[in-house]
Amino acid sequence: MFLGFREHEMRSNPCIIGGKGRNMKVLILSCNTGEGHNAAGKAVKECLERRGHQADMVDMMLLKGKRTSKVIGGAYVELVKHAPRIFGLVYKAGEAIRSAKRKSPVYQANKLLAKSLKDYLDQENYDVIATPHLYPAETLTYMKKKGWLKQKVVAIGTDYTCIPFWEETACDYYVIPHKEAVEEWVSYGLPREKLCPLGIPVKPEFAVEANQEKARSVCGLPADKPAYLVMSGSMGFGKIHIFAQELSRRCKDGEQIIIICGNNRRREYAMKLQFFKNPDVHVLGYTSHVAVYMEACDVIFTKPGGLSSTEAAVKQIPIVHTAPIPGCETKNVEFFTSHGMSIGEKTIEKQIRAGQFLMRDENARVKMKKAQRENTNPRSGYEIVTLLEKLCQNVSGNS
């Protein structure tokens, strides 16, 4: 059972018990600020649809227009990519001013979208709302205070920490990544009875039992050669071209390197030019088969994003975390390394050494995979669906 839950705990935990009643129409409300939040939302959407429910996923900023979504999402991503230290200072400032007793500038900004969101909800007939992002939770909290919101709201945390300003929201439940996170969230003023340590949701394909031989065949990789996976992420990986060059220089005996560049076309093109003469380095752009590539590889290098790290841990691939973006990623890598789920290093040389250590030491890989199994919940998405179903049942029963 996930995270040490025993049967009697499950029976008494309102975050888990429940069951399917009528089919629901669910709104998943996110924002275009990095792919982690969206990936969590898509995971819940897929689980809802597999259970026979209707689910719509909406970028809240789009309700104000494409320009608003592009400006806010673009500004966030550019700040993280090109000025991570400034982002870290902003994050620290948020930690310094956070309080459950007063509203932050972030709340004041997000309440400006309340009228647009109200108009949208008035046109639709959603039974319940889930949000994997703080910003919609802020807007929904303002709407709730104004009496504009009839739906129950489930918030989903996508990092292994309570990021600033969750404490000023008023959602009905908060899905958090691990039972050990409960005390931190409570310390910031979140009600204990509203915290559900169900884990970060990932798509069901990541929970499929690994078959490396089949995965390597699908990916066109040699069946008998060790393979590294390098995930550049939607918001960058530092000096990935230098990292990849150094890793390829140190690889031996036909070891394979797969580099996934995501939607960054410029990076994909540059790296294909960089390695076009090296048949052991495979550079990809966007792919919808990340789970298969994880399955095909022996070790992954990735930034410590909460969602991408959870995907790798659920897939049970040994992880080397590269230097975090200051803020929540620092907390993510601290959680993973303290639980034996990854190795975290800040310099390229140490990161590559850590990857080579994991590649050569089977006992270390086995130990890390065991820690990953013990600290993740592959069925988080479905358990969130059960929670949403229970909320709808309660609303129907009280109406």
Give short role names for the model-derived ranges.
Residues D172-A227, M231-S234, R266-R267:
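A nucleotide-sugar donor-handling region in carbohydrate enzymes
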Residues E35, K92-G189, K194-L198, K203:
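Active-site and donor-binding regions of nucleotide-sugar-utilizing enzymes
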Residues E295-G305:
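Acidic donor-binding loop of glycosyltransferase active sites
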Residues A43-K118, D122-Q123:
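Conserved N-terminal ligand/cofactor-binding loop architecture of enzyme catalytic domains
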Residues A364-P378:
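A short, well-ordered alpha-helix in the C-terminal region of glycosyltransferases
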Residues N377-S399:
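C-terminal alpha-helical cap of glycosyltransferases
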Residues L221-C297:
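Donor-nucleotide binding loops and adjacent catalytic segments primarily
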Residues S338-I343, T347-N363:
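C-terminal "capping" alpha-helix adjacent to the active site of nucleotide-linked donor transferases
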